[in-house]
Amino acid sequence: DIFAGWGFILRRPEISRIVLAKGMWATGGGAQIFLLIIIGMEADFGDISTGAAGIGVLYMARGFGSGFGPIVTRPLMTVTRYMPYIIGLSLGGAGLLYVGVSQAEWGVWTLVLVFFSHGCSGISWVFSTTLLQRRTDNDWMGRVAGTDNLIIVLTMGVSTIAAGYILEE
């Protein structure tokens, strides 16, 4: 059944593109865990000192952004033909905003950039999952969703391990 599900995904480009795009996002998603920790340890967020509190504030901005993006763009989900474009734009936006994080002075602006970057990530996550559900027959949905999650978790795990190894060297 698993191999039949993989075959189904590969034969349907409108499904495989979404599954592979989410997997590609995960290549940086795992390493990003360390990035937020490093920034949180060194950034100055005003009254909040660096260290554990700084890490917590960054992850708070990340979490709020991840919820904010899909809520704000929810009305756009009714237009299915726009969804692939919104997914692409939001993935690109998330990446560009992290380029901004790399260029900005680590402080309050970092929180704003992380918030909006993860707003974009949340949009791509919710829209791509919804689009997969709409495009996949019920008979195949479990295998498609399972493969989607397998690719994401495996890729994020490898990305996290690689980033940890790079930081140790």
Model-derived features with residue positions:
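C-terminal transmembrane bundle of multi-pass solute transporters/carriers
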Residues: 3, 41-169
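Juxtamembrane intracellular "pre-TM" segments in multi-pass secondary transporters
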Residues: 1-20
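Conserved extracellular-gate-facing transmembrane-helix segments in secondary transporters
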Residues: 21, 25-36, 121, 156
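Alpha-helical transmembrane segments of multi-pass integral membrane proteins
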Residues: 15-25, 84-87, 109
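Transmembrane helix irregularities
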Residues: 9-10, 27, 103, 136
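Aromatic side chains
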Residues: 8, 32-34, 59, 98
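Short coil/turn helix-boundary motifs
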Residues: 9-13, 30, 79-80, 154
